[in-house]
């Protein structure tokens, strides 16, 4: 059996999959906040219960909101302070008596989608998450591309470029401070949170993403104008990412990926922001929803 764990700031989910990546079982527990040993033991207990339930020793893959530095072995997951800067793979492997692997949760999401039968025709798949934050993962020939250190795909920390700042009004452009220490990171613009903050600062009204989208479909002038601007901002930024990766397919996840208008508007908005010979790849909605992260984490032992 293949176990995938989604390690979040508020909950830890374990799911069990077979070789066809069909989910057979799942369990969620709260994430311990203050004690590292308790955090480790919570994961160990989840895995041991799965072993007992299925009568075998399963493989263990983790999806984390950050990455494990491949050179130092230390986790860089600042929003889970209890495990940040800790050798989580070593400590879990010792306690579980087996190898444990980890990848960024966006990489796991991309891997899950890339492994679907209908998507295996694409040699390269770019996964973009437009959720609480903005991030990405890149799958090459069925395997996650992690980079030298393990931080490949940290696309949320690319910054607004010339065209994006011009679109937002230069000196009047909202410039948001990022948790990474820099300013104007895409994480604060292309995420669901960024969608709401931009509407507030550009339109002077505080609304949820759902409320903005509802107004858009009702033909509200302010919402329509804002959504068109957001699509253009996304096209500028994703266009740069396409230029860097030239993917065969893009899959969108996270809350904003449920905004169906994006799949109509983005392919039309992208060409001016690409090189003349570039091709806009198919842009698809994620198939597995909230299960994508654990499914991709489980798949780490099918692909390495």
Swiss-Prot record:
Covalent S-S links between cysteines: none
Enzyme class, spelled out: transferase
Residues at which ATP binds: 4-11, 133-140
Pathway: Cell wall biogenesis; peptidoglycan recycling
GO molecular function, a single term: ATP binding
Gene Ontology terms: biological process: N-acetylglucosamine metabolic process; peptidoglycan turnover
Reaction it catalyzes: N-acetyl-D-glucosamine + ATP = N-acetyl-D-glucosamine 6-phosphate + ADP + H(+)
UniProtKB keywords: ATP-binding, Carbohydrate metabolism, Kinase, Metal-binding, Nucleotide-binding, Transferase, Zinc
EC number: 2.7.1.59
Binding site for Zn(2+): 157, 178, 180, 185
Family to which this protein belongs: Belongs to the ROK (NagC/XylR) family. NagK subfamily.
PANTHER family, per database record: N-ACETYL-D-GLUCOSAMINE KINASE (PTHR18964:SF162), ROK (REPRESSOR, ORF, KINASE) FAMILY (PTHR18964)
Role summary: Catalyzes the phosphorylation of N-acetyl-D-glucosamine (GlcNAc) derived from cell-wall degradation, yielding GlcNAc-6-P.
Identification of the protein by name: N-acetyl-D-glucosamine kinase
Organism: Haemophilus influenzae (strain 86-028NP)
Protein's gene: nagK
